[in-house]
Amino acid sequence: MHLNFGFSAVQILWTLTFAALLVLLVVLLGRDRVRRFPWFTASMALMALRMVASRLLFGKMAPIVSNEIFLALAVVAALVALLVVVEMARRAFSSASRTAWITATLVLVAVGGVVLAAWGPWPSAKTLFAGSTLGVLRLMQLIAQKAETLADLLVIQLGILVVLFGRRFHAGWRSHVQQIVIGLSTAAMAQLAVRGIWQVIALHTTIHSRADYVRVMALEEKLFNADSVVFLAALVWWIVCLWIDEPGSKAAGAPAETAPAVAEQLLPDADEEESQAEPLPSDAK
C-alpha cells in the first residue's frame, strides 16, 4: 500500500523549518535569551522573513523587482551572520586577554580569507561594475554569497576554538554559547559541503540529453534537502538547549535561594516570642 500525502519533500521541509524557527523565536523571547544573544535572535527572525517572502512573492512580481528584494535581504542576512560570529566570540571568550583576542582574530580572518579567495569562481570586474541594473544585482549577489561563505568559515573555526578552549573561559559544554556555536558550525559545515559537492558536479558534468538534465536536477534537490535536514536538526537542538537554563544561573538556582527565605518566614522571630510571652509573677515581699 502506497501512501500519497500530496506534498513534496521540499514543502514538508519548508513547513517544518518555518515552524521550528517560530518555536525558537518564542523560546528566545519567552526564556529571556534575547538580552544575551540579540544578533542571533535577529538572524533567526530574518531567516523566517526570507522564507515567508520567498513563498509569497516568488513568481508574483516582476523579475527585476523580486531579485532586488531577495538580494537585499540576502545581503542583510549575510552581514547579520558576521555579527553573530562576533557576538558568539565575545560571549565565549569575554575574559581572554587583548593579545589573545587580536591574535585569534587575525588567524581566523586570515584562514577564512584564504579559503574564500580560493572558493568558487570570481566574476570579472567589467561584469560587476557595469553601469546597469543587472550589474548592481550581480554585485549584490556576489556580496551576499561571499559574506555568507566567510561567515560559515569563521563560525566553523570559532566552533573548534569554543569546543577546545571554551571551558577555560566559562563557556563549557552546558553553556548556551557553546550550544549555539555547535549548531551554527554544524549547519555551516553542511552548507559548505553541499555547495562544494554541487560546484564539482556542475563543473564536471556534461548534459547530453533531457534525461541527464533531469537526473542532475534531482541530485541537486537531494543535496539541498539534506542541507535543510541538518539545519532543521540544528533548530531543534537550539530549542531544547535554550529552553533549559544554564547551570548556576539565577533561574536554575532559584529554589535553593528561596528555601532559606521560606524557612525564615516559617520560624517565629525571637523578638516576637519575647513580646508574646506571659510575664512572670513578681516575688512577694
Task: State the predicted function of each range.
Residues 1-19:
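Hydrophobic transmembrane alpha-helical segments in integral membrane proteins
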Residues 2-8, 67-76, 135-150, 214-224:
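Short aromatic-rich membrane-water interface segments that cap or initiate transmembrane helices
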Residues 3-4, 24-34, 56-61:
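Short, hydrophobic transmembrane alpha-helix segments
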Residues 21-29, 61-62, 73-108, 114-130, ...:
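Internal transmembrane alpha-helix with an interfacial aromatic "cap," most often the third helix
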Residues 32-43, 100-104, 174-184:
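Membrane-interfacial loop-to-transmembrane alpha-helix junctions, especially the N-terminal start
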Residues 38-57, 77, 184-199:
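Hydrophobic alpha-helical transmembrane segments of multi-pass membrane proteins
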Residues 49-70, 197-209:
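Helix-loop junctions on the outward
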Residues 161-285:
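C-terminal transmembrane-bundle signature of multipass membrane proteins
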